[in-house]
Amino acid sequence: MPGTYLLDTAPLIYLMGQEDSVPVAVRRELADPRSEVFYSQISLWEIQIKYQLGKLPMSDEPALVLPRELDRYGFRKLDLTDTAIFGLSRLPSVHRDPFDRLLIVQAKLTGSVLVSPDKIFAQYPVTVFW
């Protein structure tokens, strides 16, 4: 069912060369032209950090790979806002990962379904699709 989706960092990484790691139903939904799919600046930041720490092998540095791939998929950028940052104070402290917590707040603020394999997201008041 087409809708508005926000990609967690993991599926964003998977779609950059490990597409088979994303379930077929998820790939189909994201490819539906009626679906609006966002990626967050937060994920770009997380990918860059992991790459610099040597924890994320890529064919080239993220600044060269990501813009090309994001354009290929037609995903839209969701900027980090002050409202999202301050929204962290209203989020239960179930999970400590700052990137994930900001993505949860962004999904709530935009009414987006969060696309993620991370089961901990189910403990938050956000809809998750995987």
Go through each PLM region and give its residues:
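Generic structural signal for small/hydrophobic residues in well-ordered secondary structure
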Residues: D8-A10, I47, L88, A107
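Active-site neighborhoods of divalent-metal-dependent phosphate/nucleic-acid chemistry enzymes
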Residues: S59-P67, D71-P117
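Active-site regions of enzymes building and remodeling cell-envelope glycoconjugates
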Residues: P125-W130
